[in-house]
Amino acid sequence: MSRRCELTGKAVLTGNLVSHSNRKTRTRFLPNLCNVTLISDTLQRRIHFRVAAATLRSVEHRGGLDAFLVKAADAQLSPGALSVKREIVKKQAAAAAQ
């Protein structure tokens, strides 16, 4: 299981911790990942993701999981999230055609 957000692609960063005496120590900055269950209004089902805490705020800000995925770039989504996005777009197109 990689340490990467499935919806935004936020991943591990590396850098230095710098002390008062300017001594540098290499460190890894890990994203705050949470296992969450989000509900898709279009698909009428629950979907499990491993996302960063900041991503949860972004999902709510955009108006829910469906709106977030439709607006998100395909390159930053995980394969699982990309398949859910395609299902949502297909179902929304079918609903609009009726």
UniProtKB/Swiss-Prot annotation:
Superkingdom in the source lineage: Bacteria
Example of a GO MF term: structural constituent of ribosome
Entry's Gene Ontology BP terms: translation
Pfam family, one: Ribosomal_L28
GO cellular component, one term: cytosolic large ribosomal subunit
Similarity comment: Belongs to the bacterial ribosomal protein bL28 family.
NCBIfam families reported for this sequence: L28 (TIGR00009)
Name used for this protein in its record: Large ribosomal subunit protein bL28
Gene: rpmB
